[in-house]
Regions:
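Bacterial Sec-dependent N-terminal signal peptides
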Residues: 1-23
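Histidine-rich, glycine-flanked metal-binding segment
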Residues: 21-22, 35, 39-81
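His/Asp/Glu-enriched, well-ordered alpha-helical/loop segment
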Residues: 32, 96-97, 102-108, 114, ...
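Divalent metal-coordination and catalytic microenvironments
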Residues: 33, 48, 53, 77, ...
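C-terminal cap of metal-dependent C-N hydrolases
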Residues: 33-36, 44, 376-421
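Polyanionic/metal-chelating signatures
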Residues: 127, 134-252, 256-265
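Extended hydrophobic/aromatic segments used for targeting, binding, or gating
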Residues: 249-255, 259-316
Protein backbone atom coordinates (compact mmCIF):
# COMPACT_ATOMS: atom_id res chain seq x y z
CA UNK A 1 0.00 0.00 0.00
CA UNK A 2 2.82 2.41 0.90
CA UNK A 3 4.39 1.71 -2.49
CA UNK A 4 1.21 2.80 -4.28
CA UNK A 5 0.93 5.97 -2.18
CA UNK A 6 4.49 6.99 -3.09
CA UNK A 7 3.80 6.38 -6.79
CA UNK A 8 0.62 8.47 -6.58
CA UNK A 9 2.48 11.29 -4.80
CA UNK A 10 5.16 11.33 -7.50
CA UNK A 11 2.54 11.30 -10.25
CA UNK A 12 0.85 14.35 -8.74
CA UNK A 13 4.03 16.42 -8.42
CA UNK A 14 6.26 14.93 -11.10
CA UNK A 15 5.28 17.13 -14.03
CA UNK A 16 8.15 18.06 -16.32
CA UNK A 17 10.24 21.02 -15.23
CA UNK A 18 10.89 23.73 -17.80
CA UNK A 19 14.46 23.58 -19.08
CA UNK A 20 16.53 26.71 -18.32
CA UNK A 21 17.30 28.82 -21.38
CA UNK A 22 20.67 28.74 -23.09
CA UNK A 23 23.06 31.68 -23.00
CA UNK A 24 22.19 34.37 -25.54
CA UNK A 25 23.89 33.70 -28.87
CA UNK A 26 21.92 35.92 -31.26
CA UNK A 27 21.39 39.67 -31.13
CA UNK A 28 17.83 40.79 -30.38
CA UNK A 29 16.03 44.01 -31.27
CA UNK A 30 12.72 45.00 -29.64
CA UNK A 31 10.91 47.73 -31.57
CA UNK A 32 7.89 49.91 -30.93
CA UNK A 33 6.98 49.06 -27.34
CA UNK A 34 6.16 51.55 -24.62
CA UNK A 35 9.20 51.11 -22.37
CA UNK A 36 8.73 51.59 -18.63
CA UNK A 37 12.30 52.07 -17.43
CA UNK A 38 11.75 51.39 -13.73
CA UNK A 39 13.17 54.78 -12.68
CA UNK A 40 10.01 56.80 -13.28
CA UNK A 41 10.72 57.47 -16.95
CA UNK A 42 8.85 56.16 -20.00
CA UNK A 43 9.80 55.92 -23.68
CA UNK A 44 6.60 55.87 -25.71
CA UNK A 45 8.06 54.30 -28.87
CA UNK A 46 11.19 52.47 -27.82
CA UNK A 47 14.09 50.67 -29.39
CA UNK A 48 15.95 48.11 -27.28
CA UNK A 49 19.03 46.29 -28.55
CA UNK A 50 20.18 43.21 -26.61
CA UNK A 51 23.65 41.76 -27.12
CA UNK A 52 25.59 39.24 -25.00
CA UNK A 53 23.05 39.40 -22.20
CA UNK A 54 23.19 43.18 -21.86
CA UNK A 55 21.10 46.10 -23.05
CA UNK A 56 23.40 47.50 -25.73
CA UNK A 57 21.13 50.40 -26.70
CA UNK A 58 17.83 51.80 -25.50
CA UNK A 59 16.12 54.93 -26.76
CA UNK A 60 13.43 56.53 -28.89
CA UNK A 61 12.81 54.49 -32.05
CA UNK A 62 11.68 57.60 -33.92
CA UNK A 63 15.12 59.21 -33.76
CA UNK A 64 17.52 56.26 -33.47
CA UNK A 65 18.81 53.79 -36.01
CA UNK A 66 20.68 50.56 -35.34
CA UNK A 67 22.34 47.87 -37.41
CA UNK A 68 20.46 44.75 -38.42
CA UNK A 69 19.93 42.19 -35.64
CA UNK A 70 19.55 38.42 -35.81
CA UNK A 71 16.09 38.59 -34.24
CA UNK A 72 13.66 41.52 -34.42
CA UNK A 73 10.55 41.58 -32.24
CA UNK A 74 7.78 43.94 -33.31
CA UNK A 75 6.30 45.06 -29.99
CA UNK A 76 4.16 47.89 -31.32
CA UNK A 77 1.26 48.60 -28.97
CA UNK A 78 2.84 46.51 -26.22
CA UNK A 79 4.78 47.34 -23.05
CA UNK A 80 8.33 46.51 -21.94
CA UNK A 81 9.26 46.34 -18.25
CA UNK A 82 12.33 45.46 -16.20
CA UNK A 83 12.02 42.06 -14.56
CA UNK A 84 10.11 42.35 -11.28
CA UNK A 85 12.03 41.61 -8.08
CA UNK A 86 10.63 39.70 -5.08
CA UNK A 87 12.58 40.62 -1.90
CA UNK A 88 12.34 38.74 1.41
CA UNK A 89 11.06 35.58 -0.29
CA UNK A 90 11.13 31.89 0.66
CA UNK A 91 10.71 30.68 -2.92
CA UNK A 92 12.60 27.43 -3.38
CA UNK A 93 13.00 26.87 0.37
CA UNK A 94 9.65 25.14 0.88
CA UNK A 95 7.85 23.06 -1.72
CA UNK A 96 4.90 21.55 0.14
CA UNK A 97 4.01 22.96 3.56
CA UNK A 98 2.65 19.65 4.83
CA UNK A 99 5.82 17.73 3.91
CA UNK A 100 8.50 18.49 6.51
CA UNK A 101 11.28 17.09 4.32
CA UNK A 102 10.60 19.81 1.73
CA UNK A 103 10.78 22.65 4.29
CA UNK A 104 14.19 24.35 4.56
CA UNK A 105 13.16 27.88 5.50
CA UNK A 106 14.39 27.89 9.11
CA UNK A 107 16.93 26.32 11.47
CA UNK A 108 16.82 25.59 15.19
CA UNK A 109 18.40 28.12 17.52
CA UNK A 110 18.03 31.86 18.04
CA UNK A 111 21.19 33.39 16.57
CA UNK A 112 22.02 31.92 13.17
CA UNK A 113 23.78 34.54 11.03
CA UNK A 114 25.87 31.76 9.45
CA UNK A 115 22.82 29.93 8.04
CA UNK A 116 22.97 30.55 4.28
CA UNK A 117 19.65 30.30 2.45
CA UNK A 118 21.33 29.96 -0.95
CA UNK A 119 22.56 26.39 -0.45
CA UNK A 120 19.02 25.25 0.42
CA UNK A 121 17.47 27.01 -2.59
CA UNK A 122 15.74 24.58 -4.97
CA UNK A 123 16.01 26.13 -8.43
CA UNK A 124 13.70 23.42 -9.79
CA UNK A 125 10.81 24.24 -7.48
CA UNK A 126 7.42 24.12 -9.17
CA UNK A 127 6.53 27.35 -7.40
CA UNK A 128 9.45 29.21 -8.97
CA UNK A 129 8.18 28.68 -12.50
CA UNK A 130 4.71 30.04 -11.62
CA UNK A 131 6.15 33.50 -10.94
CA UNK A 132 7.74 34.05 -14.35
CA UNK A 133 4.53 34.32 -16.42
CA UNK A 134 3.61 37.38 -14.31
CA UNK A 135 7.00 39.05 -14.76
CA UNK A 136 8.71 38.14 -11.47
CA UNK A 137 12.21 37.19 -12.66
CA UNK A 138 14.45 37.85 -9.62
CA UNK A 139 14.11 37.10 -5.91
CA UNK A 140 15.91 37.51 -2.62
CA UNK A 141 15.88 34.09 -0.95
CA UNK A 142 15.55 34.69 2.77
CA UNK A 143 15.59 32.39 5.82
CA UNK A 144 13.01 32.58 8.60
CA UNK A 145 12.86 31.97 12.34
CA UNK A 146 14.91 32.77 15.42
CA UNK A 147 16.23 36.17 16.49
CA UNK A 148 18.82 36.25 13.70
CA UNK A 149 17.33 34.06 10.97
CA UNK A 150 20.40 33.87 8.75
CA UNK A 151 21.84 35.25 5.54
CA UNK A 152 19.92 35.83 2.31
CA UNK A 153 21.06 35.73 -1.32
CA UNK A 154 19.65 37.06 -4.58
CA UNK A 155 18.84 34.74 -7.48
CA UNK A 156 17.46 34.79 -10.99
CA UNK A 157 14.51 32.47 -11.49
CA UNK A 158 15.60 30.35 -14.46
CA UNK A 159 18.44 28.02 -13.50
CA UNK A 160 19.53 24.40 -13.14
CA UNK A 161 20.78 24.76 -9.58
CA UNK A 162 21.56 27.32 -6.89
CA UNK A 163 25.06 27.94 -8.22
CA UNK A 164 23.66 28.94 -11.63
CA UNK A 165 20.84 30.94 -10.05
CA UNK A 166 22.96 33.05 -7.69
CA UNK A 167 23.40 36.71 -8.65
CA UNK A 168 24.58 38.03 -5.29
CA UNK A 169 25.35 35.61 -2.49
CA UNK A 170 25.13 36.52 1.19
CA UNK A 171 23.79 40.01 0.56
CA UNK A 172 22.52 40.58 4.09
CA UNK A 173 21.66 39.29 7.55
CA UNK A 174 18.05 39.15 8.75
CA UNK A 175 17.20 40.13 12.33
CA UNK A 176 13.73 39.71 13.85
CA UNK A 177 13.35 42.67 16.21
CA UNK A 178 11.39 42.04 19.44
CA UNK A 179 7.87 43.45 19.72
CA UNK A 180 7.27 46.03 22.42
CA UNK A 181 3.73 44.75 22.93
CA UNK A 182 1.68 41.64 22.29
CA UNK A 183 -2.00 40.80 21.99
CA UNK A 184 -3.62 38.40 24.44
CA UNK A 185 -5.94 35.61 23.30
CA UNK A 186 -5.87 34.03 19.86
CA UNK A 187 -7.05 34.96 16.37
CA UNK A 188 -10.67 33.85 16.89
CA UNK A 189 -10.94 35.46 20.35
CA UNK A 190 -8.39 38.28 20.51
CA UNK A 191 -7.77 39.88 23.88
CA UNK A 192 -6.30 43.20 24.86
CA UNK A 193 -2.87 44.59 24.06
CA UNK A 194 -0.18 43.91 26.65
CA UNK A 195 3.28 45.42 27.01
CA UNK A 196 6.17 43.03 26.45
CA UNK A 197 8.00 43.00 29.80
CA UNK A 198 10.95 41.27 28.15
CA UNK A 199 11.39 43.88 25.41
CA UNK A 200 14.40 45.67 26.97
CA UNK A 201 16.16 42.43 28.02
CA UNK A 202 15.68 41.06 24.51
CA UNK A 203 17.28 44.16 22.98
CA UNK A 204 20.16 43.88 25.43
CA UNK A 205 20.63 40.28 24.33
CA UNK A 206 20.84 41.39 20.70
CA UNK A 207 23.29 44.15 21.59
CA UNK A 208 25.47 41.71 23.53
CA UNK A 209 25.58 39.37 20.55
CA UNK A 210 26.64 42.18 18.20
CA UNK A 211 29.23 43.41 20.72
CA UNK A 212 30.74 39.94 20.96
CA UNK A 213 30.67 39.46 17.20
CA UNK A 214 32.40 42.76 16.44
CA UNK A 215 34.94 42.20 19.23
CA UNK A 216 35.70 38.80 17.70
CA UNK A 217 36.12 40.33 14.23
CA UNK A 218 38.51 42.95 15.62
CA UNK A 219 40.58 40.30 17.38
CA UNK A 220 43.51 38.63 15.63
CA UNK A 221 43.95 35.68 17.96
CA UNK A 222 40.39 34.55 18.70
CA UNK A 223 39.41 30.95 18.11
CA UNK A 224 37.43 30.58 14.87
CA UNK A 225 33.70 31.15 15.40
CA UNK A 226 31.58 30.52 12.30
CA UNK A 227 28.46 32.47 13.40
CA UNK A 228 30.58 35.51 14.29
CA UNK A 229 32.47 35.19 10.99
CA UNK A 230 29.15 35.58 9.18
CA UNK A 231 28.66 39.02 10.79
CA UNK A 232 31.64 40.37 8.86
CA UNK A 233 30.67 43.09 6.39
CA UNK A 234 27.85 44.75 8.36
CA UNK A 235 29.96 47.75 9.37
CA UNK A 236 31.72 48.07 6.01
CA UNK A 237 28.51 47.90 3.97
CA UNK A 238 29.39 44.65 2.19
CA UNK A 239 26.31 43.17 3.84
CA UNK A 240 23.04 44.86 4.72
CA UNK A 241 21.20 44.38 8.00
CA UNK A 242 17.52 43.64 7.36
CA UNK A 243 15.46 44.25 10.50
CA UNK A 244 11.92 42.88 10.65
CA UNK A 245 9.87 45.46 12.58
CA UNK A 246 6.40 46.97 12.20
CA UNK A 247 5.73 49.16 15.26
CA UNK A 248 6.80 52.80 15.54
CA UNK A 249 8.81 52.23 18.73
CA UNK A 250 10.50 49.15 17.30
CA UNK A 251 11.48 51.01 14.12
CA UNK A 252 12.89 53.98 16.07
CA UNK A 253 14.85 51.63 18.34
CA UNK A 254 16.16 49.75 15.29
CA UNK A 255 17.47 52.98 13.73
CA UNK A 256 19.16 53.92 17.01
CA UNK A 257 20.67 50.42 17.06
CA UNK A 258 22.05 51.02 13.56
CA UNK A 259 23.71 54.26 14.64
CA UNK A 260 25.13 52.83 17.84
CA UNK A 261 26.69 49.84 16.08
CA UNK A 262 27.84 51.80 13.01
CA UNK A 263 25.88 49.58 10.63
CA UNK A 264 26.43 51.12 7.22
CA UNK A 265 23.35 49.79 5.42
CA UNK A 266 20.07 48.87 7.10
CA UNK A 267 16.62 48.09 5.70
CA UNK A 268 13.38 47.83 7.67
CA UNK A 269 11.31 44.82 6.61
CA UNK A 270 7.58 45.12 7.26
CA UNK A 271 7.50 48.74 8.36
CA UNK A 272 3.73 48.92 8.80
CA UNK A 273 3.98 52.07 10.94
CA UNK A 274 7.17 53.32 9.31
CA UNK A 275 5.33 56.41 8.06
CA UNK A 276 5.22 57.63 11.68
CA UNK A 277 9.03 57.62 11.78
CA UNK A 278 9.55 58.62 8.15
CA UNK A 279 11.77 61.63 8.87
CA UNK A 280 14.10 59.54 11.03
CA UNK A 281 14.32 56.88 8.32
CA UNK A 282 15.08 59.45 5.63
CA UNK A 283 17.74 61.21 7.72
CA UNK A 284 19.52 57.91 8.38
CA UNK A 285 19.12 56.55 4.83
CA UNK A 286 17.11 53.56 5.97
CA UNK A 287 14.83 52.04 3.34
CA UNK A 288 11.69 49.95 3.83
CA UNK A 289 10.58 46.64 2.34
CA UNK A 290 6.91 47.23 3.02
CA UNK A 291 4.51 44.75 4.61
CA UNK A 292 2.21 42.95 2.18
CA UNK A 293 -0.20 45.39 0.54
CA UNK A 294 -3.14 42.98 0.21
CA UNK A 295 -3.63 42.55 3.94
CA UNK A 296 -5.86 43.63 6.81
CA UNK A 297 -5.02 46.50 9.18
CA UNK A 298 -3.10 45.51 12.31
CA UNK A 299 -5.61 47.20 14.65
CA UNK A 300 -9.42 47.21 14.58
CA UNK A 301 -9.79 50.98 15.02
CA UNK A 302 -7.48 52.19 12.25
CA UNK A 303 -8.08 53.06 8.62
CA UNK A 304 -9.09 49.88 6.81
CA UNK A 305 -7.26 51.15 3.72
CA UNK A 306 -3.96 51.87 5.46
CA UNK A 307 -2.17 48.85 3.90
CA UNK A 308 -3.00 50.30 0.46
CA UNK A 309 -1.92 53.86 1.36
CA UNK A 310 1.29 53.00 3.20
CA UNK A 311 3.55 53.11 0.16
CA UNK A 312 2.42 56.61 -0.84
CA UNK A 313 2.90 57.92 2.71
CA UNK A 314 6.53 56.76 2.63
CA UNK A 315 7.21 57.88 -0.94
CA UNK A 316 5.83 61.36 -0.17
CA UNK A 317 8.13 61.51 2.86
CA UNK A 318 11.17 60.74 0.71
CA UNK A 319 11.82 57.23 2.07
CA UNK A 320 13.15 54.60 -0.34
CA UNK A 321 10.45 51.93 -0.30
CA UNK A 322 9.83 48.64 -2.12
CA UNK A 323 7.27 45.85 -1.82
CA UNK A 324 7.63 42.33 -0.44
CA UNK A 325 5.25 39.45 0.09
CA UNK A 326 6.03 37.68 3.39
CA UNK A 327 3.04 36.11 5.12
CA UNK A 328 0.51 33.35 4.61
CA UNK A 329 0.89 31.40 1.35
CA UNK A 330 3.82 33.67 0.51
CA UNK A 331 5.53 31.42 -2.04
CA UNK A 332 2.32 30.81 -3.98
CA UNK A 333 1.42 34.50 -3.83
CA UNK A 334 4.76 35.73 -5.17
CA UNK A 335 3.21 35.85 -8.62
CA UNK A 336 0.80 38.54 -7.33
CA UNK A 337 3.62 41.00 -6.59
CA UNK A 338 2.86 43.22 -9.64
CA UNK A 339 -0.76 43.53 -8.54
CA UNK A 340 0.29 44.79 -5.11
CA UNK A 341 2.06 47.59 -6.97
CA UNK A 342 -1.09 48.13 -9.02
CA UNK A 343 -3.07 48.59 -5.81
CA UNK A 344 -0.56 51.20 -4.64
CA UNK A 345 -1.15 53.03 -7.92
CA UNK A 346 -4.88 52.98 -7.24
CA UNK A 347 -4.25 54.56 -3.83
CA UNK A 348 -2.22 57.61 -4.67
CA UNK A 349 0.98 56.73 -6.51
CA UNK A 350 1.46 57.19 -10.22
CA UNK A 351 1.85 54.02 -12.28
CA UNK A 352 5.56 54.67 -12.74
CA UNK A 353 6.08 55.31 -9.01
CA UNK A 354 4.26 52.06 -8.27
CA UNK A 355 6.42 50.22 -10.79
CA UNK A 356 9.55 51.44 -9.02
CA UNK A 357 8.36 49.64 -5.87
CA UNK A 358 9.05 46.27 -7.55
CA UNK A 359 11.92 47.23 -9.87
CA UNK A 360 14.33 50.13 -9.38
CA UNK A 361 13.70 50.68 -5.68
CA UNK A 362 13.94 46.97 -4.92
CA UNK A 363 17.26 46.75 -6.75
CA UNK A 364 18.65 49.69 -4.77
CA UNK A 365 17.63 48.22 -1.42
CA UNK A 366 19.11 44.84 -2.35
CA UNK A 367 22.31 46.35 -3.73
CA UNK A 368 21.94 45.04 -7.30
CA UNK A 369 20.96 48.30 -9.01
CA UNK A 370 24.24 48.42 -10.92
CA UNK A 371 22.90 45.63 -13.16
CA UNK A 372 19.18 45.09 -12.47
CA UNK A 373 15.97 46.96 -11.72
CA UNK A 374 15.94 49.48 -14.57
CA UNK A 375 16.19 49.46 -18.35
CA UNK A 376 19.47 51.23 -19.14
CA UNK A 377 22.33 50.75 -21.58
CA UNK A 378 25.00 48.47 -20.14
CA UNK A 379 22.71 46.78 -17.62
CA UNK A 380 21.48 43.20 -17.70
CA UNK A 381 18.83 42.46 -20.30
CA UNK A 382 16.39 41.14 -17.69
CA UNK A 383 13.03 42.31 -18.96
CA UNK A 384 9.73 41.20 -20.44
CA UNK A 385 7.12 42.23 -22.99
CA UNK A 386 3.49 42.47 -21.88
CA UNK A 387 0.41 42.88 -24.05
CA UNK A 388 -0.87 45.54 -21.65
CA UNK A 389 -0.36 47.13 -18.24
CA UNK A 390 1.64 44.57 -16.23
CA UNK A 391 0.37 45.98 -12.92
CA UNK A 392 -3.22 45.08 -13.84
CA UNK A 393 -4.13 41.40 -13.62
CA UNK A 394 -6.49 41.75 -16.59
CA UNK A 395 -3.76 42.98 -18.93
CA UNK A 396 -0.65 41.31 -17.48
CA UNK A 397 -0.23 39.01 -20.49
CA UNK A 398 3.44 38.30 -21.12
CA UNK A 399 4.60 37.14 -24.54
CA UNK A 400 8.40 37.30 -24.12
CA UNK A 401 10.68 37.31 -21.09
CA UNK A 402 14.46 37.52 -20.88
CA UNK A 403 16.91 36.98 -18.03
CA UNK A 404 20.42 38.18 -18.84
CA UNK A 405 19.42 38.13 -22.50
CA UNK A 406 18.23 34.52 -22.40
CA UNK A 407 14.67 34.05 -23.65
CA UNK A 408 13.06 31.96 -20.92
CA UNK A 409 10.07 29.64 -20.93
CA UNK A 410 6.78 31.08 -19.69
CA UNK A 411 5.16 27.69 -19.28
CA UNK A 412 4.26 26.14 -15.94
CA UNK A 413 1.97 23.47 -14.59
CA UNK A 414 -0.70 26.18 -14.40
CA UNK A 415 -0.41 27.13 -18.08
CA UNK A 416 -0.42 23.45 -19.06
CA UNK A 417 -3.68 22.91 -17.20
CA UNK A 418 -5.12 26.09 -18.71
CA UNK A 419 -4.40 24.90 -22.26
CA UNK A 420 -5.67 21.41 -21.47
CA UNK A 421 -9.05 22.49 -20.15
CA UNK A 422 -9.44 25.31 -22.66
CA UNK A 423 -9.21 22.61 -25.32
CA UNK A 424 -11.80 20.54 -23.51
CA UNK A 425 -14.39 23.32 -23.48
CA UNK A 426 -13.61 24.30 -27.07
CA UNK A 427 -14.36 20.72 -28.09
CA UNK A 428 -17.68 20.83 -26.24
CA UNK A 429 -18.72 23.94 -28.20
CA UNK A 430 -18.32 22.14 -31.55
Amino acid sequence: MKKYIVILFISLFGFAQQTPALKQSKTILILGAKAHLGNGQVIQNSLISIKEGKIATIGDATVMKVAKHDITIDASGKHVYPGFIAPNSTLGLVEIDAVRASDDESEIGEFNPHVRSIIAYNAESKLVETTRPNGVLLAQITPRGGRIAGTSSIVQLDAWNWEDAALKTDDGIHLNWPRSYSRAGWWAEPGGIEMNKNYDPQIKEIQAYFDNAFAYLDSKNAKKDIPFEAMKGLQSGEKALYINANGEKEIIDAVLFKKKNKIKKMVIVGGYYAFKAANLLKENEVGVLLKRVHDLPLLEDEDVNLPYKNAKLLVDAGVLVALQNAGDMERMQTRNLPFYAGTCAAWGLTKEQALQLITGNSAKLLGIDNQYGTLESGKSATLFISEGDALDMKTNLISFAFIDGRQISLESHHTELYERYKGKFEQQKK
